[in-house]
């Protein structure tokens, strides 16, 4: 059995999705992700992962502050439904910055959820826009709407970097061609849709255990996601190590193998020793859980 029992509830829609429901869904996703145990290199119930400045309590405190902001993202998406999607992104930025400031105040200046604010702010706004247009709230529609919000963002924000000081995102793109969270959003969470969600869905069908399903999904994300958090901490060598080790564990069966959970704990210890934390994959895992509450819908909706 896995370390924590979590019971998912797929949303059965009989009325339009409300902002309050989005807030609740994001809160569940963030808490589910951080409490899932064992997660290699990441904060969980077992330990603080490869972090000295944050722990489970700081993530829970951050979640309590961040989740309510999703109502504002939802309303912004709803009220700008007539605005071109590429223009909405600029309108969302001040909301995101204010949310981030509240997070930093709650955590004493520690960045617990910056990536999650970016991802879930976009998804919440996408949900609001779909509700305003009377469209179904489905996985593919939500992700496609995020892609429309973010169209052209990577080239505009990363490829034209100037000046002497580059942000981490700019440096990763210019040096390695890695687009990070921006690229994932602009693609409409392609890694989630093509890697994570199929694994999670299959594991739920086979085991009925959401914890095992999420842990196996996390391994797949760590194996294939070009996580720029890992590059920031360990360079390309750190990213390659994590990907290769995750792939090795998957070849052995992952969490379904004999001793699979113990292998994850050992992987956790190794990443802590190497100071490697796959925070980007953790964010995508939370997105996977959030999206799993909604029907997939058509891949190319009309």
From Swiss-Prot:
One of its GO terms (biological process) is prosthetic group biosynthetic process. Catalyzes the formation of 2-(5''-triphosphoribosyl)-3'-dephosphocoenzyme-A, the precursor of the prosthetic group of the holo-acyl carrier protein (gamma chain) of citrate lyase, from ATP and dephospho-CoA. Signal peptide: none annotated. The keyword Phosphoprotein does not apply. GO terms for molecular function: ATP binding; triphosphoribosyl-dephospho-CoA synthase activity. PANTHER family: 2-(5''-TRIPHOSPHORIBOSYL)-3'-DEPHOSPHOCOENZYME-A SYNTHASE, TRIPHOSPHORIBOSYL-DEPHOSPHO-COA SYNTHASE. It catalyses: 3'-dephospho-CoA + ATP = 2'-(5''-triphospho-alpha-D-ribosyl)-3'-dephospho-CoA + adenine. Pfam families: CitG (PF01874). Keywords: ATP-binding, Nucleotide-binding, Transferase. The gene is citG. This is 2-(5''-triphosphoribosyl)-3'-dephosphocoenzyme-A synthase. HAMAP family: CitG. It comes from Klebsiella pneumoniae.
């Amino acid at each position: 059995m896995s370390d924590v029992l979590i019971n998912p509830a797929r949303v059965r829609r009989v009325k339009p999705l409300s902002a309050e429901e989005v807030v609740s869904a994001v809160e569940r996703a963030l808490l589910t992700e951080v409490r899932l145990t064992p997660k290699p290199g990441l904060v969980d119930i077992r330990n603080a992962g490869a972090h000295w400045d944050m722990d489970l309590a700081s993530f829970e405190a951050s979640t309590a502050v961040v989740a309510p902001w999703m109502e504002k993202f939802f309303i912004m998406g709803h009220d700008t439904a007539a605005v071109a999607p590429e223009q909405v992104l600029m309108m969302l930025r001040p909301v995101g910055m204010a949310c981030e400031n509240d997070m930093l105040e709650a955590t004493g200046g520690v960045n617990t959820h910056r990536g999650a604010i970016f991802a879930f702010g976009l998804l919440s706004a996408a949900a609001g826009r779909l509700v305003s247009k009377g469209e179904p709230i489905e996985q593919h529609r939500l992700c496609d709407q995020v892609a429309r919000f973010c169209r052209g963002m990577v080239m505009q924000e990363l490829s034209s970097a100037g000046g002497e000081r580059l942000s981490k995102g700019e440096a990763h793109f210019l040096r390695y061609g890695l687009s990070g969270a921006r690229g994932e959003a602009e693609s409409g969470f392609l890694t989630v849709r093509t890697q994570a969600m199929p694994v999670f869905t299959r594991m739920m069908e086979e085991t009925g255990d959401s914890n095992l399903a999420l842990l196996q999904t996390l391994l797949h994300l760590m194996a294939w996601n070009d996580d720029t958090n890992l590059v920031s901490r360990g360079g390309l060598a750190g990213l390659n190590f994590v990907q290769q080790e995750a792939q090795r564990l998957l070849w052995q069966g992952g969490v379904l193998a004999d001793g699979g959970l113990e292998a994850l704990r050992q992987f956790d210890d190794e990443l802590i020793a190497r100071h490697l934390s796959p925070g980007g994959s953790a964010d995508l895992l939370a997105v996977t859980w959030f999206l799993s509450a909604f029907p997939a819908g058509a891949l190319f909706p009309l």
